[in-house]
């Protein structure tokens, strides 16, 4: 049986991809890591890890059900943050202000329905609405702290969340390749 590495989520708008590129250029060579390619910037609602074809079919059924029960909504991107914390930053991300509760509820619904089908990722964490822009390898602490302080309250734009998708992730030496397996429009 074929296994695929996958997540449930959606791709962000071009404007957010451009913000990520601008931040990358601003801190060039002071924060080193794997920056997310503009075409790959996305919001993950649930990382599934390796799933079988049979599990993928169940996830698709769940997304179809969820899409019928939810209508499109807007989110606003605001501020930068890091995971797990500023003392050991591994991930640099753009946060969500307006619409964060709706995103959280959507992510919980995805996780709940998938769990009912026995699809429970190994590394399940509490959902924090964010868009990863860099996986940090090394950094200048002063630069990182200044960046976080500078952008703490900055609004970066907005998106309409109007669809959710099962997306496969193929890891390659040049970075992941994301492929939409199936997507559903909210309210459809």
From Swiss-Prot:
* Record EC number: 3.1.4.58
Chain ranges for the short sequence motif HXTX 2 as given in the UniProt record: 130-133
Main EC class the enzyme belongs to: hydrolase
Keyword Acyltransferase set for record: no
Source organism superkingdom: Bacteria
One GO term of the cellular component aspect?
cytosol
In terms of InterPro entries, this protein maps to: AKAP7_isoform_gamma, Cyclic_Pdiesterase, Phosphoesterase_HXTX, RNA_CPDase
Fetch the Pfam families from UniProt.
LigT_PEase (PF02834)
* Alphabetical keyword list: Hydrolase
Q: Where is the active site?
A: 42 (proton donor), 130 (proton acceptor)
GO terms, molecular function: 2',3'-cyclic-nucleotide 3'-phosphodiesterase activity; protein kinase A regulatory subunit binding; RNA 2',3'-cyclic 3'-phosphodiesterase activity
Indicate which residues form the motif HXTX 1. 42-45
- Provide the reaction this enzyme catalyses: a 3'-end 2',3'-cyclophospho-ribonucleotide-RNA + H2O = a 3'-end 2'-phospho-ribonucleotide-RNA + H(+)
Q: Keyword Hydrolase on this protein?
A: yes
Q: What does this protein do?
A: Hydrolyzes RNA 2',3'-cyclic phosphodiester to an RNA 2'-phosphomonoester.
Q: Which family does it belong to?
A: Belongs to the 2H phosphoesterase superfamily. ThpR family.
Q: What HAMAP family does the database record attribute to this sequence?
A: RNA_CPDase
Q: Mind telling me what this protein is named? A: RNA 2',3'-cyclic phosphodiesterase
Source species, please? Aquifex aeolicus (strain VF5)
């Amino acid at each position: 049986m074929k296994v695929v590495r996958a997540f449930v989520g959606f791709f962000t708008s071009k404007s957010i991809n451009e913000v990520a590129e601008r931040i990358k250029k601003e801190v060039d060579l002071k924060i080193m890591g794997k920056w997310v390619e503009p075409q790959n910037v996305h919001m993950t609602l649930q990382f599934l890890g390796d799933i079988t074809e049979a599990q993928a079919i169940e996830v698709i059924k769940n997304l179809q059900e969820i899409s019928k029960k939810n209508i499109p909504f807007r989110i606003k991107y605001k501020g930068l943050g890091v995971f797990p914390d500023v003392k050991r930053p591994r991930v640099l991300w753009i946060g969500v202000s307006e619409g964060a509760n709706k995103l959280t509820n959507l992510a919980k619904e995805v996780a709940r329905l998938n769990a009912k089908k026995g699809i429970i990722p190994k590394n399940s964490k509490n959902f924090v609405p964010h868009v990863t822009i860099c996986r940090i390898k090394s950094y200048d602490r002063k630069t990182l702290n200044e960046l976080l302080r500078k952008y703490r309250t900055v609004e970066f734009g907005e998106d309409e969340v109007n669809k959710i998708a099962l997306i496969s992730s193929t890891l390659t030496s040049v970075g992941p390749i994301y492929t939409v397996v199936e997507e559903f429009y909210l309210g459809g």
